[in-house]
Amino acid sequence: MTVKLTIDCMGGDHGPSVTVPAAVKFVRAHPDAHLMLVGIESAIRAQLKKLKALDDPALTIVPATEVVAMDDPVEVALRKKKDSSMRVALNHVKEGAAQACISAGNTGALMAVSRYVLKTLPGIERPAIAFALPNPTGYTMMLDLGANVDCEPQHLLQFAEMGHALVAALEGKERPTIGLLNIGEEVIKGNETIKRAGELLRASTLNFRGNVEGNDIYKGTVDVIVCDGFVGNVALKTSEGLAQMLSDIIREEFGRSLMSKLMALLALPVLMRFKKRVDHRQYNGAALLGLKSLVIKSHGSADAYAFEWAIKRGYDAVKNGVLERLTRAMADNSVSLGDGEHDAGGAGHTGPAAGQHAEPPAAQSSKA
């Protein structure tokens, strides 16, 4: 089966200078992939020419005349820039020409345009960004990581249901464990939104294990961690900054003297393995959960190596039939979670979900 993906080549901080080289490298390593490069044709052609890939049959240029800037308000992307690379890429997925879209564009705009073009799955109020964070035994699914900075308690409940369905679909776990990210394990901790969300989760049939703290994120304490997009994005980027700092410190210390350089030479295999494990670029690419089609969000600041990983997330999700499996899991969950409404200050809600992923990935923010 040929995996067809659309690439929003103009998205992100670096545009075609990153997205096109990543696409070229990806198709050369994956002969069953076909990528549609969407954006300003002249800019894409210039990059392809530089890479001697103008005639590559696995790459197709799809012209778009507008670009959604990283600081464009959502309404501009949605109402004014109807021929943007982002919108055209999503339209091709909607029309069935491609199976997934990969974009490093403005997160708020991508979420809004994706919801408008692709629509949400039944029962989903707000799609969320989900990211698989590595832990000692595998990965922990965390959501939301930037799509919804302000959430009501029932939204956090729905994120938990979506995470439940995603892990159930990917891992075959009947009862994935759920944790609510908070400033303490005690039920009295947190703001009113978190406290109410905890009440809703405890009243649900989900396998809710209570509050988890920031130091639980990488321990594998639970299968799914739920939070609003503001907290989730800060936690994610703090982790990435820490990983980068550790790599820089190790490099600096081993370069201090001739003796330390000799020690580094002896320890090189270990250092290379360490560098690979903490390199956040290989976890780039997060799913927008709750849409009727697959959309993968890359970091806006991604380099070509990181963006290639985001493409791989979409490719793997299609190959593994993740959307179909999630849709089935959601249908099962709607039965297992019950049809009763969860009262949240007058807002009714019933449970389903949706998403992506096959191996540890990453996620985003409003500019991410």
From Swiss-Prot:
Region named Disordered: 335-368
Localisation per UniProt entry: Cytoplasm
A Pfam match: FA_synthesis
Catalytic activities: a fatty acyl-[ACP] + phosphate = an acyl phosphate + holo-[ACP]
GO process annotations (BP): fatty acid biosynthetic process; phospholipid biosynthetic process
Family matches, as InterPro entries: FA_synthesis, Phospholipid_synth_PlsX-like
Annotated keywords: Cytoplasm, Lipid biosynthesis, Lipid metabolism, Phospholipid biosynthesis, Phospholipid metabolism, Transferase
Cellular component GO terms, alphabetical: cytoplasm
Disulfide links within the chain: none
EC category: transferase
Pathway: Lipid metabolism; phospholipid metabolism
Superkingdom of origin: Bacteria
This enzyme's EC code(s): 2.3.1.274
SUPFAM superfamilies reported for this sequence: Isocitrate/Isopropylmalate dehydrogenase-like
Molecular function via GO: phosphate:acyl-[acyl carrier protein] acyltransferase activity
Principal subcellular localization: cytoplasm
Subunit (UniProt): Homodimer. Probably interacts with PlsY.
PANTHER family associated with the record: FATTY ACID/PHOSPHOLIPID SYNTHESIS PROTEIN PLSX, PHOSPHATE ACYLTRANSFERASE
Family listed: Belongs to the PlsX family.
Reported function: Catalyzes the reversible formation of acyl-phosphate (acyl-PO(4)) from acyl-[acyl-carrier-protein] (acyl-ACP). This enzyme utilizes acyl-ACP as fatty acyl donor, but not acyl-CoA.
Name by which UniProt lists this protein: Phosphate acyltransferase
Source organism (scientific name): Burkholderia vietnamiensis (strain G4 / LMG 22486)
